[in-house]
Regions:
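Signature of the catalytic double-stranded beta-helix
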Residues: 133-146
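Short, low-complexity disordered leader/linker segments with a strong preference
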Residues: 1-39, 351
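N-terminal secretory/targeting leader peptides
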Residues: 26-131, 146-351
């Protein structure tokens, strides 16, 4: 073989290898044409894709990518709110039974079955997104184990990310950002009620629809829940006082049916998990934009005549100290593992 022929052969091999890299073959092997067509149902707690930015990010990244990488053979249908007729509190059970394949949910609805995920809504444990991320990473192993144990391995946590900050809005001014005595405040659950009572107020648990009616009728003088939802509901038309305390943020979780997952071809499993991991990383990178969107929402309240009371760093520290008994009681009620995770979080945060 001539020297030129050898050089040509080497060059040809290099060109072929570069082509394979550029076409993605080095990362994603070609899928077999014999792989089956599969359709999954992914239910989202948000009532629509516009309601929750994090849900939108997941849906618009994972679903098209999985479809493209499987040549259109693995389709994931996004279902919003009540389309399947499954209440958010029942998502894990629906996944465990195989009636649902994926669910995006606010885990606060599932604290009854999985008490340890109540750690994500401990009031005043975190006061900014940097602190939130620290605690989320510490708590995640406990959440993964809890989902697995609660549903006998039939439910798996695949994505964890930030939800929205809970703030207090009122029709009647509070005595101070530290003193809510004399106010009846709508809350969504027991943890929120404990926080309101610690601040001297009275918490009343109602549904979302009942909250709006109660505000109009004066049954309650305020609401304590995530600020984005209150803005979307135009509560600024009734509540003219906003107390920015970043009381709790909470998680969103994407949970998956292992029954459905185990039925997938290995190629589909790998692609799905890869795309979920990419979307999760992207969602963490959008924490700063979440803050900017909060600023935009706050301006909407200001433009509608609301008084904005921003907690100072000293007030946030004092509020956090007042809530320590709540953290310790909740963790103790959950069990030793929750106590240990809380200790790790407090050490990491210096609280």
């Amino acid at each position: 073989m001539s020297k030129n022929s050898i050089l040509f052969s080497i060059l040809l091999v290099i060109i072929i290898m570069l082509s394979m890299v550029l076409l993605g073959y080095s990362q994603t092997p070609a899928l077999s044409s014999e792989l089956p067509k599969v359709t999954w149902k992914w239910n989202f707690y948000a009532m629509s894709i516009e309601d929750e930015e994090m849900a939108k990010n997941l849906a618009t990244q994972v679903i098209p990518a999985v479809k493209e990488r499987t040549g259109g053979k693995f389709i994931i249908e996004a279902l919003w709110g009540p389309e399947l007729g499954i209440a958010p509190a029942n998502y894990p059970k629906a996944l465990a039974s195989g009636a649902l394949d994926l669910a995006w949910t606010y885990p606060g609805y599932n604290i009854g079955d999985i008490p340890i995920i109540g750690l994500c809504v401990l009031p005043m444990l975190v006061s900014n997104t940097e602190e939130y991320k620290i605690t989320a990473e510490i708590f995640r192993p406990g959440y993964e184990k809890a989902y697995e144990e609660a549903y006998n391995g039939a439910v798996r946590l695949v994505v964890q990310g930030p939800y929205n900050w809970a703030q207090l809005v009122t029709t009647k001014p509070a005595k101070s950002i530290m003193d809510w005595s004399g106010l009846k405040i709508r809350v969504a659950g027991k943890v929120e009620m404990q926080y309101i009572e610690t601040m001297g107020g009275t918490g009343l648990m109602t549904t979302w629809d009942e909250m709006v009616t109660s505000l109009r009728q004066g049954v309650v003088q305020g609401a304590f829940t995530d600020f984005g939802s209150m803005t979307n509901a135009k509560l600024y038309e009734m509540c003219k006082n906003v107390y920015v305390v970043n009381a709790m943020m909470g998680d969103h979780h994407v949970i998956m049916s292992t029954k459905s997952f185990d039925k997938l071809p290995k190629e589909y499993q790998d692609i799905l998990l890869e795309e979920m991991a990419k979307a999760e990383a992207y969602n963490w990178s959008t924490i700063v934009p979440v803050n900017s969107r909060f600023g935009e929402a706050l301006k909407t309240w200001e433009d509608n005549g609301a008084n904005i009371f921003q907690a100072t760093p000293e007030e946030l520290k004092a509020l956090s100290a007042l809530c320590v008994p709540i953290w310790e009681k909740i963790a103790s009620d959950i069990g030793p593992e929750a106590v240990l995770l809380l200790q790790k979080a407090r050490t990491a945060l210096g609280k």
